[in-house]
C-alpha cells in the first residue's frame, strides 16, 4: 500500500506503481555516491530493524562477489533452506537484484516497499533505497538465510549497516581507487571494515 505524500518529504507524492519506483530511482542516479552509513542507520532505526529474522551473510571483495553470493544461495537451497539474495548491478531489470529462492521480487511489491523505506528516510540514495527495500521484503518472506552482496568497498557500504553474522571476502584488486584508496592495502582495509564485532 502506498503511503500518503506527507509521510515522504522530499518525494513528490506516493509511488503507486513499479514504473513510479523506477522513475524515482532514475532521478536519484544509478551511479550517484554519497558515502556514509548515516542514512542507512537512520532508516533501520526508524523501521525498528535491529536484527533480521535469520542468519545473514555479507559478501565483499572486488572480483566474483555476485557469483560467490549466487553460489552460496544455490548451496543453501540444495540443503532445503529458504534463501534470500541481494546483488548488484542488474542486467535487464532492477527486479533481478532482490531474489527469494531465485525468484525476483514481483513488480507489484515494489511501490509499497519503496514508500515504507522513503517514509523512514527520504534521503536514501539509489543503492541505499534498494537495500532498505530488500530488508523489508526479506523480513516478510520468512527466510532461513539471507545473503547481501556489498556494492562498493566495505567501510561505508549500505550493506555494512545491516546486522550480519558472517562476512565472506572474494579476491581484492584495484578498483574505485578514487573512493577506496590508491593501492591494494588501502582498498583491502576499506573492505575489511565490513567486519563487525561478533562476526565470523
Task: Cite the ranges covered by each PLM segment.
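ATP-dependent carboxylate-amine ligase catalytic core
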Residues: 31, 37-52, 78-162, 174, ...
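Short active-site-proximal "capping" loops at secondary-structure junctions
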Residues: 63-65, 90-91
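Short functional linear segments
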Residues: 2-61, 68, 74-79, 86
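Short aromatic/hydrophobic contact patches that present stacked aromatics
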Residues: 58, 97, 200
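Internal gly/pro-rich beta-alpha loop/helix module
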Residues: 165-166, 178-200
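Short intrinsically disordered, low-complexity coil segments enriched in acidic
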Residues: 1-2, 134, 146, 200
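Short histidine/acidic/glycine/proline-rich micro-motifs that form metal-
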Residues: 63, 173-174
